[in-house]
Amino acid sequence: DRDARTVHGRRGDGTAFAVPYDRLLIATGATSIRPAIEGMDLPGVFTVKNLEDGRRIKRFLRERKAERAVILGMGYIALEMTEALVDLGLAVDLVKPRAGLLPWLHRELAKPVRELLEQRGVGLYDGYRVDRISADGDRLTVHAGDLALSADLVIAAIGVRPCASLAEQAGLELSVGGSIATDR
């Protein structure tokens, strides 16, 4: 109740509660964006955002003895996953639809990152839109136009979507991308 500056809800046992507030912080987090690509539901295809996602991937790596990975995306999370997988001895390819690695960085700042990735044997395929992911047994193939990349696992690390339904239900204004609008 924004007018009364009170949060109303129910506890786990079903009893109601009301908590008054002077200022309210809504920190409901975000979920991984799951691209609308055929094959995202195949075994060995993951999204990644949090520790539990990392644990699922680690478990998969142990069970399958993976050697090759394709990561969809070239942002911070994709680069963190790339570093971890390369350190574990996997060959890694990165794919994304728009040209440029870390496009929000100045080109001169992104250049050494690209060079380091190339030195570590990482395949960089920017400018390729993934059409689908297919499976032949345990082997996955990422299809992007005329490009076909083989992998034991595929990780979508293309960003997050804000969990703003509570704010929306409370009548708060949402901003670009569905995040909660702020006064700052």
What residue ranges belong to the model's regions?
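Short glycine-/small-residue-rich Rossmann-like dinucleotide-binding loops
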Residues: 11, 25, 29-30, 155, ...
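FAD-site-proximal beta/loop scaffold in flavoenzymes
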Residues: 41-65, 141, 148-184
